[in-house]
Amino acid sequence: MVANTGPLINTFGKLFDDENEIEQAKMQLIGAMDDNKGDIIKIASYPFLVINVAAIDNTAFPTKYLSNVIKDELWADCSTCQKREYCHIFHNQKLIKTNQGRVFDFLSKYYIWETEYGHRMTIRSMTEQLAYMMTGGVECEDIVPIDLHKMMFFNLFFGYVGTIQNAQAQNVLAVKLAYENHFDQKRLRADEDLIIKRSYDELFSPEVVAIIHNAEKTSMFLKGWAEELRRIYFFLNIVPDESWRRDTEDVFSKQYTTYLDVRGGASKPSKSQKMLIIDALRMMYLGTVISNSNTIPITLSKESGIAQSVQLVVGELSVNDIEVISKPDSALNMEKQNLVLRVQKKEEIKLSLPMIDYFEELRNGVISTNIDPQLSHGIESMKAQLLKVVYIDSDDLEMIVLNNNGYEKINIEIDDNVIRLN
């Protein structure tokens, strides 16, 4: 078990005397870590079984772990405890168990989201957060009567005590991360029924409705009450699956549910996902999604994602050569499917969730010049791979000039030191 791969690679290189052998052996070892196939390989006659644990999807762990934690046989003593009527820990266990379908669904979507956005949590981090979600960091002997809603798991998960953010909860890094997402501040299409009409009976079970009514007595007019209602809704709503799917888009992103469908193998990439990629490419290179042409000019441009008014064309990509497919992540992650852009049946480019969400914003005209470095790297890597596929080595120069009506192509000829524009 190696926590830091740098010393492993360097130490392995010291087994060899020849400089070329050292570099070759290092590259083979790095390649094996990237492939993560779980096969025994030989590097310079040394047998290796390389498993890159950090690349193994662990997002299924939280729900499996929590399903064991809430088993009734583990809580038998609590049912006879003198504090059982006001113990938030015991109430959290019962509430989670009664509503585990929706609770597990939200937890799964949340941890996948964090992983896809580069915040892969360790098993330790996840268990810390789930333990805090159950207990709030309070020992049994310290439990005293309190408004129960304040210490319910839907608040503790995000680091709140009722409507108030708990500064001490920020010491649990996974809780701090959940808080900093501010999911509970996002407007939902369910807000009208949840916050304005207060149609609790249509949104929650009678048990949860009772919790909300009791909480309203002291918290209804406090700042942060609407956010607490949303936190309750995330974990405990009983709305139809289609309505919850819609709300999931509001909480996370518009493309998230279709991305999850492909990631989990429930469906193949859709035509709408292909059109999203095509529209995003047009926005990146042409500054508009409107085009009468079946081709997309691939140009040299700066790394801002904003189309320049004048660009040098290095090739063209036919929309018929664009496919969006799904492929297994790796031999050790067979249940996880990656969304892949395939160009001309040969070049394959992995599409991450941040890239998909960025494409959605780009298509809608939302241009950001301050994007995450990891996302920026993914976009520029894709552009470089597209350039490799479509590049044509030619003496002819072609430019595109963007205007209010779209763009026009200009051919440049250089003959006897004279430049001609056609």
Task: Show which residues each predicted segment covers.
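Extended alpha-helical coiled-coil/bundle linker/stalk regions that scaffold oligomerization
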Residues: L66-V319
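Detector for Asparagine
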Residues: N4, N10, N20, N36, ...
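An almost-null, non-specific background feature
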Residues: G6-T11, F16-D18, G38, D57-P62, ...
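Extended charged low-complexity segments that act as oligomerization/scaffolding linkers
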Residues: M1-R102
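C-terminal domain/tail detector
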Residues: R230-N422
